[in-house]
Curated annotation (Swiss-Prot):
Keywords: ATP-binding, Covalent protein-DNA linkage, DNA replication, DNA-binding, Endonuclease, Helicase, Host nucleus, Hydrolase, Metal-binding, Multifunctional enzyme, Nuclease, Nucleotide-binding, Nucleotidyltransferase, Repressor, Transferase. This is Replication-associated protein. Residues 129-138 have a biased composition (Basic and acidic residues). The lineage of its organism: Viruses, Monodnaviria, Shotokuvirae, Cressdnaviricota, Repensiviricetes. GO terms for biological process: DNA replication. Its EC number is 2.7.7.-, 3.1.21.-. It is found in: Host nucleus. A motif (RCR-1) lies at residues 18-21. Pfam families: Gemini_AL1 (PF00799), Gemini_AL1_M (PF08283). Essential for the replication of viral ssDNA. The closed circular ssDNA genome is first converted to a superhelical dsDNA. Rep binds a specific region at the genome origin of replication. It introduces an endonucleolytic nick within the conserved sequence 5'-TAATATTAC-3' in the intergenic region of the genome present in all geminiviruses, thereby initiating the rolling circle replication (RCR). Following cleavage, binds covalently to the 5'-phosphate of DNA as a tyrosyl ester. The cleavage gives rise to a free 3'-OH that serves as a primer for the cellular DNA polymerase. It comes from Maize streak virus genotype B (isolate Tas) (MSV).
Length: 355
């Protein structure tokens, strides 16, 4: 089985997909039909599966899949069939891949109509004007369909449209980021509950259940949590141990906002430097933010709570107007730490032997 680490780094996006199933004795027709059903959302156009005998005597299976819309997956086991795991590649030259598949097959099955790859976006100049030159839209459509990475996408644009690439690079980079977003790694808490055990007040346990551990119901809003107290008490460690979250310290950076996060953490940021504080504290949905080095965007498609952590010297409540304080208290559970309070239990030391 692939490791979770390799699975987190996997990404495939293309209209042409080449699959190789090693040591696979399955019937090509059955595999073809199963793959066709798997990729239904991307509108499959053609598939061919061929079985061949490997040098070691085992049966291998090769498949070429063509879809109308690019297959976009981040799960390396998406194409697993009956426990058989394939090697997944982008077929950059579908003509050569198909020829390779049909080299020495023992059994073959096809469905749909094969779509040969054009030899060049710009056509064959040796044919003069007899062949219509593709439009800019057609060339871009080909680039979008066949590019397999951000780097390849920008390289193809640079080759086909050098002037546009030089003068409008920021727009192409923006579209590249949309087509090939950064893969979100599987969340592993940087502060898992361990020894010494993390703990919290009973009143906060009552807040945790409906706001962190229960899913958001449509039409309902969560409640945020404000914790103020001294430094080095473990409150940040405790807050970060609860699950997948957006974490901001020193400043709020919307460019890295993760919609899959369960909650947000604002840690040690003065009240006056926290943009959209009302939206965060009020667990509001679908509000617009303005990243420092990016375009405005809508975030937080569902209500999620924010845990605000502050020290006594930067208590948010001391900086608020009466109206702001009223809103804050109505939308936030406020917890002021007691003297000597910690968010972890001290480690149990082994008994010392008497001398």
């Amino acid at each position: 089985m692939a490791s979770s680490s390799s699975n987190r780094q996997f990404s495939h996006r293309n209209v042409n997909t080449f699959l190789t199933y090693p040591h696979c004795p399955e019937n090509p027709e059955i595999v073809c039909q199963m793959i066709w059903e798997l990729v239904g959302r991307w509108t499959p156009k053609y598939i061919i599966c061929a079985q061949e005998a490997h040098k070691d005597g085992d049966m291998h299976l090769h498949a070429l899949l063509q879809t109308e819309k690019p297959v976009r997956i981040t799960d390396s086991r998406f194409f697993d069939i009956e426990g058989f795991h394939p090697n997944i590649q982008s077929a950059k030259s579908v003509n050569k891949v198909r020829d390779y598949i049909l080299k020495e097959p023992l059994a073959v099955f096809e469905r749909g109509t094969f779509i040969p790859r054009k030899s060049s976006f710009q056509g064959n100049p040796s044919k003069g004007n007899s062949e219509k030159k593709p439009s800019k839209d057609e060339i871009m459509r080909e680039i979008i369909s066949h590019s397999t990475s951000k780097l390849e996408y920008l390289s193809m644009i640079r080759k086909e449209f050098p002037y546009d690439w030089a003068t409008k690079l920021q727009y192409f980079e923006y579209s590249a980021n949309k087509l090939f977003p950064e893969i979100q790694e599987e969340f592993i808490s940087p502060h898992p509950p361990s020894s010494p055990d993390l703990l919290c007040n009973e009143s906060i346990k009552d807040w945790l259940q409906p706001n962190i551990f229960q899913p958001t119901d449509e039409g309902t809003r969560k409640q945020s949590l404000y914790i103020v107290g001294p430094t080095r008490t473990g409150k940040s460690t405790w807050a970060r141990s609860l699950g997948l979250h957006n974490y901001w310290q020193n400043n709020v950076d919307w460019s890295s906002y993760n919609e899959d996060a369960i909650y947000n953490i604002v840690d040690d940021i003065p009240f006056k430097f926290c943009p959209c504080w009302k939206q965060l504290v009020g667990c509001q949905k679908e509000f617009v933010v303005n990243p420092k080095y990016g375009k405005k965007k809508k975030v937080q498609m569902k209500s999620k709570p924010t845990i605000i952590l502050a020290n006594w010297d930067e208590d948010w409540m001391n900086e608020m107007t009466p109206g702001q304080l009223e809103y804050f208290e109505a939308n936030c559970m406020i917890y002021k730490m007691s003297p000597g309070e910690k968010w972890y239990s001290p480690p149990v030391l082994p008994p010392t032997e008497e001398v």
